[in-house]
């Protein structure tokens, strides 16, 4: 099985490195591992479809894509399986790898530029390769609901017997006795006014 980062690598060798150049691609990527949260996710082996446009700009390559995938999970109230269609737009700038500085002034300028950029926010190209993993993962996770429901008016499960409320009668209930008073339940009986 391919590592996650290898599965999302895209070779942009067809795109010339001249500002203003553009290429469009349609991709179907297979996820090597689960992407999502505990209760809902795009499962390993599922396809993620991308309609992608690469634009060459002076700093690097601007990637714009429409992502679509299918997430599987379970309803937080009734635990029924659910499917959720994910449709999300991605736009990221991948910077060209910096050229190695030759002179002292170039090294100083390169250090200042590196200090100005937050390393976590900068996506770098590796030669002609673009790693789409981080933006795809972020787009999917941000589009997933924290508490997925099978329907907005799902009633959930009866806490007493665990059966779905929607399949129970309206009069369904469980007699709950406060454990502090449970010992008195054996004393019950109709009140006898003769004694």
Where are these regions (language model features)?
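Structured interface patches
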Residues: 1-195
């Amino acid at each position: 099985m391919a590592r996650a980062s290898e599965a999302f690598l895209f070779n942009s060798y067809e795109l010339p490195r001249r500002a203003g150049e553009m290429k469009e691609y349609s991709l179907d990527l297979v996820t090597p591992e689960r992407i999502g949260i505990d209760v809902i996710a795009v499962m390993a082996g599922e396809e993620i479809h991308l309609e992608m446009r690469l634009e060459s700009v002076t700093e690097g390559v601007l990637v714009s894509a429409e992502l679509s995938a299918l997430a599987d999970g379970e309803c937080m109230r009734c635990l029924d399986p659910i499917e959720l269609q994910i449709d999300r737009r991605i736009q990221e700038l991948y910077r060209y790898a910096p050229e190695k500085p030759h002179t002292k002034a170039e090294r100083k300028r390169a250090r200042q530029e590196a200090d100005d950029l937050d390393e976590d926010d900068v996506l770098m190209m590796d030669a002609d390769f673009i790693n789409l993993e981080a933006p795809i993962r972020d787009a999917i996770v941000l589009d997933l609901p924290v508490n997925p429901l099978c329907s907005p008016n799902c009633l959930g499960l009866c806490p007493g017997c665990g059966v779905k409320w929607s399949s129970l009668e309206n009069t369904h209930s469980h007699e709950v006795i406060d454990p502090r008073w449970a010992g008195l339940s054996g004393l019950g009986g109709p009140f006898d006014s003769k004694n």
